Each structure stands twice: as C-alpha cells, then as structure tokens.
Design a protein with these regions (language model features):
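Active-site beta3 strand of CheY-like receiver
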Residues: 45-51
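Two-component/phosphorelay signaling modules centered on CheY-like receiver
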Residues: 13-30
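Acidic catalytic/metal-coordinating carboxylates
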Residues: 33-37, 60-63
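The feature encodes the CheY-like receiver
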Residues: 57-58, 81, 85
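Short amphipathic alpha-helix used as the core "switch/output" element in two-component signaling
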Residues: 40, 62-73
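Active-site residues of response regulator receiver
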Residues: 10, 53, 81
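C-terminal output helix
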Residues: 87, 105-114
Length: 132
C-alpha cells in the first residue's frame, strides 16, 4: 500500500523530528530545512501535503509557498506560525495555503487539518481522472 506523502519544511530539527514522529505511521514523510531543499523535495516526491514553517532563514514561508504552488499546484500546504498576524493569514490564503496553524500547535488539531487537506487532494485527483 502506498502511503500518502507528507513534506515537513522547518529550519528547526526538533520541530521536524516531532512532526515526523507524529505522522510517520500514516504517511511517507520527507523533510526539508531550507527553501532549496523544499523545492527539490516537492519536485522529487510530489507530496500530497506540506507542513511549512512561516519563518525560514534567508526567505519566508510565503515565498516557499509561492514556489511550491508553482511546481505542484495540487499540493495542499499548511503553514505553521508562531505569529498571530491577520495580514500574513490573508496573504497565505490568497496564495493557496490550505490552513494556518499556530505554534505551539495542538497535535490533534494538526492531525485533523492534515487529514482534511489529504481528503481535498484525494477528491481533486478523483475529479481529474478521466471517465471511462
């Protein structure tokens, strides 16, 4: 059985490891700690869902979101942020983010959002399949 692919993009190893622990049983998990690595992983792995930190070194999560959506528009991106910023939320939503989740995050809430995002990608794939 092929597990759905999940990409975790965060510059903090402890966050990536925690999220990998949470999601490794139901997902094929990939990690990236930078914009360059994230873009390469999206091209290579074609994840269904990306968990993306908003604050990244040398760039911000909004720029990473832009590039992910350009490469793989069907991918659902959940932004992780320690900031409570309405302007950021609006911009992320306008660029196609599925959701914003505050740090520290509630694992149950994050799992629910990832499952909802996965359901959306599955529904989009069914719609995209040609009828025979």
């Amino acid at each position: 059985m092929n597990l759905p692919r999940l990409l975790i993009v965060d510059d903090e190893m402890s966050v990536r490891e925690s999220l990998k622990f949470v999601f490794s049983k139901g997902f094929s998990v990939f990690e990236a700690n930078s914009l360059e690595t994230a873009v390469a992983k999206v091209k290579e792995a074609r994840p269904a869902v990306v968990l993306l930190d908003v604050l990244m070194p040398r760039t911000d999560g909004i720029e990473v979101l832009r590039q992910i959506k350009a490469i793989h528009p069907g991918c659902e991106v959940i932004m992780l942020t320690a900031m409570n910023n309405r302007q950021l939320a609006a911009k992320a939503t306008d660029l196609g983010a599925f959701a914003l989740v505050g740090k520290p995050f509630d694992v149950v809430d994050l799992l629910a959002k990832v499952n909802s995002a996965l359901a959306k990608t599955a529904a989009q794939e069914k719609v995209a399949l040609p009828q025979t």
